[in-house]
Amino acid sequence: MNEKATELDLVNTHFVSPHGLDDDEHYTTAYDLAVLTNYALNNDKFKEIVGIKTTTITVGDYSRTITNTNELLGNTEGIYGVKTGFTANAGRCLVTACKRDNLDIIIVVLGADTKEIRGLDTVNIINYVYSNFEMVDTYNMISEAFENYKETQNINVTKSLEEPQIRLSNNFTYIYPININEVKNLKTSIYTISRIRCKY
């Protein structure tokens, strides 16, 4: 577990046990939990399991129905996981994954006094994000910048110290969540290499 934490660059996380009971050497942060959750959700089986609200386990003649302790699962639009937690020191904790309008978010609430507060804080954050942010595809902005870009200076390099690696490409796209009020302020700039090493 600690090897995986190092691999994911979870610098504020250290595991002592898989059950997570209180220990001075067992700790993490909301950010690290979000990174870990994002990684785990790439595993289809994990994603399936954390999204199950109830299931029945049958062994022989014995059956038992178990219910997910995530009270928001199935009761709040877009939520598809992930995990509740509680210890005396940690308080009520909840890591939540939600998707609305093609925007996936992960919310981490730690140290709540009650399950109700934990759930309310999570829902409030989710509603804030989806009310104030939207996904913006910058492809058209970048393409327009490249179309309008004009080279203003030619440089002749007769004896370069190494093969020049100069490339200008608009064959890419970026999609970001951006505050709705800031979308109109987006600008695209192209910066050229300011110095090329060569000998005369």
Regions found by a protein language model. Name each.
Residues 13-23:
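Surface-exposed aromatic
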Residues 10-11, 25-200:
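Domain-terminus/edge residues, biased toward the C-terminal soluble/receptor-binding domains
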Residues 1-13:
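Short, charged, amphipathic alpha-helices and their helix-cap/turn boundaries
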